[in-house]
Amino acid sequence: MAKEQFQRNKPHVNVGTIGHVDHGKTSLTAAITSVLAKKGFAEARGYDQIDAAPEERERGITISTAHVEYETENRHYAHVDCPGHADYVKNMITGAAQMDGAILVVAASDGPMPQTREHILLARQVGVPAIVVYMNKCDLVDDPDLLELVEMEIRELLNEYEFPGDDTPIIKGSAVKALEGDAAAEDSIMELMAAVDSYIPQPERPVDQPFLMPVEDVFSISGRGTVATGRIERGVIKKMEEVEIIGIKDTQKTAVTDIEMFRKLLDEGQAGDNVGLLLRGLKKEDIERGQVIIKPGTVKPHKNFKAEVYVLTKEEGGRHTPFFNNYRPQFYFRTTDVTGCCTLPEGVEMVMPGDNVNLEVQLITPIAMEKAMRFAIREGGRTVGAGRISEILD
């Protein structure tokens, strides 16, 4: 059978289910596909198909994630569901599954539990823009006052982590009943999807953002000048536009005199393109891998930052022993390693493999960075951790 052409007639949004173990994240994922399948918007996926999530490797870390896709009248969704709690932590910090929004599942019979809190905190730290709540297992609760109480608890918890708890849509239902074909429960799934459609904002497309390209390689072409190659991360670059080259060395200004892709000349390059940029008046030694080329003034180089970090276990190929204050590994940003010194949070003596920790880092050379940017932590070329910048300090 020929591969189906991906139709880009609806805006695309990435979502994921989060919440405490056994509160019904996977059942809800199955219910969404089964209810939408009846409307011709999805392929029904059973609980077992989703629960047997394949393992993926992202930046040297193995993560189990299930991906399903479905559509509503308005949008096309890619949906991720992780079986294990550790998979969520790894997933959210490494950005293996970018979430434009999350569906928080809370069992009405239990109310918010420790991982409910932890997942909301993670969503806050990794910058998930919006959360919609599905209160599951409402069929197991007879007392309407109890449902109201659980709803209040959820709203308070969201407020505590700076999500707008009072305005967050909370839909009550039962994923299992919906899978069994119960009409009211199926309606709750449609209500949830309507909330996801309207409440989770449409992500800004990379081409609409200011131009940025990490430099992967540099060479000189005799008689023409210096070419920097890389994949455009965001934005658009046109011939003769001015750019800045930042990070590692002092910031330099130049202009792009030619853009080349697959040995052909282009008038413009855009997000996702692998291009070579011919840079006016630069020698090969003026620019190196690890720097980034940007629209002037849009990003600054920094040395000091705070980051949310996941430390790999021995089984994941990480360290076998803990590390202590002033630990000095390499931080891999986009295309290069830079040595940095780690300061542990107050009261934390050491960090064990498998831990999730907030570190302060001081790099030996400045690197182009922004809040929410992701990096790997390496020792001698092997990945020992993954992180995301939560705050820039200089």
UniProtKB/Swiss-Prot annotation:
Residues 81-84 are annotated as: G3. Keywords: Cytoplasm, Elongation factor, GTP-binding, Hydrolase, Magnesium, Metal-binding, Nucleotide-binding, Protein biosynthesis. It catalyses: GTP + H2O = GDP + phosphate + H(+). PROSITE patterns: G_TR_1 (PS00301), G_TR_2 (PS51722). Residues 10-204 form the tr-type G domain. Its EC number is 3.6.5.3. Residues 19-26 are annotated as: G1. CDD domains: EF_Tu (cd01884), EFTU_II (cd03697), EFTU_III (cd03707). It is found in: Cytoplasm. GTP binds at residues 19-26, 81-85, 136-139. GTP hydrolase that promotes the GTP-dependent binding of aminoacyl-tRNA to the A-site of ribosomes during protein biosynthesis. This is Elongation factor Tu. The gene is tuf.
